């Protein structure tokens, strides 16, 4: 005779529904000015988590008043941003560094940025709390457009277009100016590089007397010892020091070409 089999009750589980606790309700009932003063003293690394508390918190975290208060309190803070461009998707994915509540540590958290601009083959560079998205490929066409992501509010605004349409170029910052090199359809000494003055919001060409020996497309670049070092897809390297307006060929093999990790801090 077989042993009796006990009927097991099927245990069902459901996703927990987050409801406001008395403590969180009390916090949300505080005056807006006081909430902003409190949030201004919290690290930006905690903002992605706090934005999940409620729509009110999400709105406060993206408000101009909060960042004005942080500035007055001397609590301005830079954060790490990651942008992923997927060839099959027109819209890029944006992430920012977030502190993990449990266990300790950090994680890249996805952030929602409405009306995000395409970043395929564009030049991304951070200046203060802004990330400039310069040129690139839009429907397989070179572009001269420039847009700016304000990392405080995660909103976009337009900036003056470049003088030349560019694709697969490089962008670097020195002394408050953005230098954009390569990527034009027809490279010559007068259009291989141009510079954007952030204060005056104007573009000007930078004459490159050795443009004929430079690659049209740029693969890697970095600012090293006051000079912009650029490497094309053919491995040809060139360095430009804007402070003394000096160009120099740096050969086909250089430690810059051995591999780099790209980060944006804004």
From Swiss-Prot:
Q: Which domain of life is it from?
A: Eukaryota
Keywords on record: Kelch repeat, Repeat
Pfam families reported for this sequence: F-box, Kelch_FKB95
Q: What is this protein called?
A: F-box/kelch-repeat protein At4g39560
Protein's organism: Arabidopsis thaliana
Query: Locate the F-box domain: which residues?
Result: 24-70
Kelch repeats mapped onto the chain:
130-176, 178-223, 226-266
Keyword Repeat recorded: yes
């Amino acid at each position: 005779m077989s042993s009796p089999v006990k009927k097991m009750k099927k245990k069902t589980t459901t996703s927990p529904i987050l409801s406001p606790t008395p403590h969180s309700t009390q916090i949300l009932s505080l005056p807006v000015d006081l909430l902003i003063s409190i949030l201004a003293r919290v690290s930006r690394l905690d903002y992605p988590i706090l934005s999940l508390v409620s729509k009110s918190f999400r709105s406060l975290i993206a408000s101009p008043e909060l960042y004005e208060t942080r500035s007055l309190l001397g609590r301005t803070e830079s954060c790490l941003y990651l942008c992923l461009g997927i060839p099959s998707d027109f819209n890029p994915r944006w992430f920012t560094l977030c502190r993990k509540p449990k266990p300790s540590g950090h994680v890249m958290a996805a952030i929602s940025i409405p009306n995000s601009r395409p970043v395929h083959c564009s030049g991304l560079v951070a200046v203060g709390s802004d990330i400039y998205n310069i040129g690139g490929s839009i429907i397989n066409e070179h572009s001269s457009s420039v847009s700016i992501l304000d990392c405080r509010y995660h909103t976009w605004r337009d900036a003056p277009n470049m003088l030349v349409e560019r694709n697969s170029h490089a962008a670097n910052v020195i002394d408050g100016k953005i230098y954009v090199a390569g990527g034009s359809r027809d490279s010559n000494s007068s259009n291989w590089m141009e510079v954007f003055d952030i204060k005056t919001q104007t573009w000007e060409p930078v004459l490159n007397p050795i443009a004929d020996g430079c690659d049209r497309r740029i693969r890697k670049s970095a600012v090293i010892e006051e000079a912009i070092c650029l490497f094309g897809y053919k491995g040809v390297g060139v360095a430009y020091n804007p402070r003394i307006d000096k160009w120099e060929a740096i050969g086909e093999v250089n430690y810059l070409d051995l591999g780099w990790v790209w980060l944006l801090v804004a």
